[in-house]
Amino acid sequence: MDHSPEFRKRRARNWLTLGFTYSAMYMGRYNLSLANPYLSKAFGWDKAQIGAIISPALLVYGLSAMFNGPICDKIGGRKSMLIGATGALIFNFLFGLGGYMGFLGKGSLLLAYFATIWSFNSYFQSYSALALIKVNAGWFHISERGIFSAVFGSMIQGGRFLIFVVGGPIVAMLPWQWVFFVPSAIIAVMVTFVYFSVQNGPEDCGLAPLDVQDASSGDTE
């Protein structure tokens, strides 16, 4: 596709901001796998009790991805990413904070707290892929989306890789709660970038609209 330099530059800014935000959110999703042994040690929980935190969250994520699609279509990808990332940073922080809530004890009450908080995190996490795809659909012609899909996949793997690279030293040097606090802080930074840098389409930046030639354009020929 023959795009102007201004368009390419603005699209790259949009895409990189979304991509790094998505990676940051993945850090705030896979960090629990690093914290599991420390939760077990701190509270004396077995695998079944840890599973009681993870299983409801997986169910919530699967259902939310289905139900949040229409919401994303209605409010737009930019708002959806802001909602999802803000929720993820809040509930990652609250999960880490649970380690300091001694008044909840170490039994079923604390377990219920962690399970509830992680399920809320999963709900907001479900917005991320929906929002990213929605926004980029307005910036990429249908013939360019193969490249977009490849980069999208790389961002997913990047987020998974980062939490294990960054999270390992965190849990080695700091209390386990920081494996939730640090991703929360990174997501907070990216929310700011999304707010100021991301737009749903070229027309929102004062550029000419792009005919993406998919079903949304009304003419695929």
Task: Tell me what each language-model feature is.
Residues 156-202:
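Helix-loop-helix hairpin linking two adjacent transmembrane segments in secondary transporters
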Residues 30, 58-66, 160-161:
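Residue-level signature of mid-helix packing/kink "hotspots" within the transmembrane helices
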Residues 198-221:
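Flexible cytoplasmic inter-helical loops of multi-pass small-molecule transporters
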Residues 13-47:
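Extracytoplasmic
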Residues 117-157:
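Cytoplasmic helix-loop-helix junction between adjacent transmembrane helices
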Residues 86-107:
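C-terminal ends and interior cores of transmembrane alpha-helices
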Residues 91, 105-127:
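Hydrophobic core of transmembrane alpha-helices in multi-pass small-molecule transporters
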